[in-house]
């Protein structure tokens, strides 16, 4: 019984830490949810006919030219293209949905960082602090604010 309560307490601590991390990320980046598309979003997203459905999903994994409508701007990022296509299927070109997806990806990455740090350090408090510092650092804002930077989370 003692071991179970100790495990439950540790799980509760980690869930609270991850919940707090997600809340802080949400509060810090909520103002970006209505940002417009800009810069590379035009050629890799808005003007890219390949992400308007899943009919070319298998080709995302073999043809880097599908990344952009511009000749020679291809990059091998199949999971990014797949996520764009899924976003498009769900909500068309609703910029808020694209930004929410980026925010969720960023929060998931932060959660994974927290788990990794706890595994290495054993300290949930220090791990949470470092994770929040990473998650809200200005250098980490690009993948949340800029849809085309989704792959940099």
Pin down the residues of each PLM region.
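Polytopic membrane enzymes that build or remodel cell-surface glycoconjugates and lipids
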Residues: 1-153
């Amino acid at each position: 019984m003692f071991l179970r309560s100790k495990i439950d307490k540790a799980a509760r601590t980690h869930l609270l830490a991850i919940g707090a991390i997600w809340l802080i990320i949400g509060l810090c980046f909520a103002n970006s949810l209505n940002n417009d598309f800009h810069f590379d979003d035009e050629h890799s997203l808005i003007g890219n006919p390949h992400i308007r459905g899943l009919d070319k999903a298998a080709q995302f994994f073999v043809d880097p030219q599908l990344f952009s409508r511009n000749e020679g701007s291809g990059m091998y990022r199949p999971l990014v293209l797949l996520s764009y296509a899924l976003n498009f299927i769900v909500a068309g070109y609703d910029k808020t949905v694209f930004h929410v997806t980026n925010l969720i990806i960023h929060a998931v990455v932060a959660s994974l960082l927290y788990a990794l740090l706890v595994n290495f350090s054993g300290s949930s408090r220090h791990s949470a602090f470092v994770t929040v510092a990473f998650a809200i650092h200005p250098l980490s804002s690009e993948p949340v604010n800029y849809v085309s930077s989704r792959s940099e989370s």
